[in-house]
């Protein structure tokens, strides 16, 4: 997406995703944009904003996306737990076998560490 400079093409990428989301869930997709791979251009950010999207970056990620080289449970915890911080936006890829296996325990550990979880809608709402 970072190479898309044509607003119509950029918008089509997002509206196609919105359509797929609606088809899969029966709901409208929240207007948040995470630049794939964290790669973006100033033009992308401007177009996303003009289309009503809030751009959100992650503050913590690890190499969980490679299905042929999944981290072990121990490696995942060693990467994630010490790097977690207040306000963290943590990127966990849904295609990761390791993430699926450790998610319940990971969330429990974070709760035990005093963290709470909110949706992006909750984080950006006027409280």
What are the language-model segments listed below?
Residues 1-25, 39-86, 99-101, 105:
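Alpha-helical scaffold elements lining the catalytic groove of polysaccharide deacetylases
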Residues 27-32:
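A short coil-to-beta-strand element that immediately follows conserved catalytic motifs
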Residues 33-36, 48, 55, 90, ...:
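Conserved, mostly hydrophobic/aromatic
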Residues 34-38, 58-61, 92-96, 120-123:
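Active-site-proximal beta-strand/loop segments in catalytic clefts of secreted hydrolases
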Residues 98-127:
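C-terminal domain-boundary segment and adjacent tail
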């Amino acid at each position: 997406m970072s190479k898309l400079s044509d607003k119509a093409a950029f918008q089509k990428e997002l509206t196609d995703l919105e359509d797929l989301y609606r088809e899969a869930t029966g709901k409208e997709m929240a207007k948040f944009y995470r630049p794939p791979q964290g790669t973006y251009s100033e033009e992308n950010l401007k177009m996303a904003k003009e289309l009503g999207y809030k751009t959100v970056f992650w503050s913590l990620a690890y190499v969980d996306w490679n299905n042929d080289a999944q981290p072990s449970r121990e490696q995942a915890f060693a990467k994630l737990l010490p790097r977690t911080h207040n306000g963290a936006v943590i990127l966990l890829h849904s295609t990761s076998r390791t993430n699926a296996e450790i998610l319940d325990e990971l969330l429990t550990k974070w709760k035990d560490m005093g963290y709470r979880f909110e949706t992006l809608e909750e984080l950006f709402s006027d409280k």
